[in-house]
């Protein structure tokens, strides 16, 4: 049986945030440039509120300026777009993030398209998606960026490895595949319609699970010794009526088969905000020509 090592995303993210804070201090000292991140929250979604609170705390901890805009759930689309335009024009704001999901009456794609691509620190704008696809410098979605950072840290050179990404979302699956291609992996994108999904997964040296289905990837889907990146965050009921967090991979089954695996929680999750700060720092530098 293989001894499976958990990948500690929390520790890696803490180190990344510390390095970002050092770089921000140098920017402030040498260029009088304090990177600024604006976060826009529409409505009262509890999970979004917690996430925004965490973002604000970590932004301040990194020495960046944090701007929060909390709008009521019934905000008109024109008013939200006007705020985005105002932030696009504000030189103190280097990164703009509109927290998703938006209330149903707002067109998410239209709102995201209104953000200046140079300030699109979520990496969701079609310009950034297109730049990533053709191999140009782009602001990249935070979660897949964090996944690839963890992979490079633990595996070193990824060139030639077979990578299977289960999930084809614009937020994780597609950009993760693009980033792995950039590292010279041989990449397969699989999804719910893939024929013989377990067999496809068994070919993977790197298996990225990003489908949003609790424990869908079973232990016998994993190639012995493979590295498993579990992006899923799912709440499932416990016998006592409470809930627990699980990923898209059956973690207990993966132990003894995978070589490395990200646990849920504590794996990929902490990397997302750290990479948001990295993107804000990158955006600030590019806007100032540094």
Swiss-Prot record:
E.C. number: 1.5.1.5, 3.5.4.9
Domain of life per record: Bacteria
GO cellular component assignments: cytosol
CDD domains reported in the protein's UniProt record: NAD_bind_m-THF_DH_Cyclohyd
Reactions catalysed, as given in the entry: (6R)-5,10-methylene-5,6,7,8-tetrahydrofolate + NADP(+) = (6R)-5,10-methenyltetrahydrofolate + NADPH; (6R)-5,10-methenyltetrahydrofolate + H2O = (6R)-10-formyltetrahydrofolate + H(+)
Source organism (scientific name): Azorhizobium caulinodans (strain ATCC 43989 / DSM 5975 / JCM 20966 / LMG 6465 / NBRC 14845 / NCIMB 13405 / ORS 571)
Record's function text: Catalyzes the oxidation of 5,10-methylenetetrahydrofolate to 5,10-methenyltetrahydrofolate and then the hydrolysis of 5,10-methenyltetrahydrofolate to 10-formyltetrahydrofolate.
UniProt keyword list: Amino-acid biosynthesis, Histidine biosynthesis, Hydrolase, Methionine biosynthesis, Multifunctional enzyme, NADP, One-carbon metabolism, Oxidoreductase, Purine biosynthesis
The protein's assembly and partners: Homodimer.
PANTHER family recorded: C-1-TETRAHYDROFOLATE SYNTHASE, CYTOPLASMIC, C-1-TETRAHYDROFOLATE SYNTHASE, CYTOPLASMIC-RELATED
Phylogenetic lineage: Bacteria, Pseudomonadati, Pseudomonadota, Alphaproteobacteria, Hyphomicrobiales
List of residues binding NADP(+): 167-169, 192, 233
GO molecular function: methenyltetrahydrofolate cyclohydrolase activity; methylenetetrahydrofolate dehydrogenase (NADP+) activity
Key word Nucleotidyltransferase present: no
One GO term (biological process): purine nucleotide biosynthetic process
Name of the protein this chain belongs to: Bifunctional protein FolD
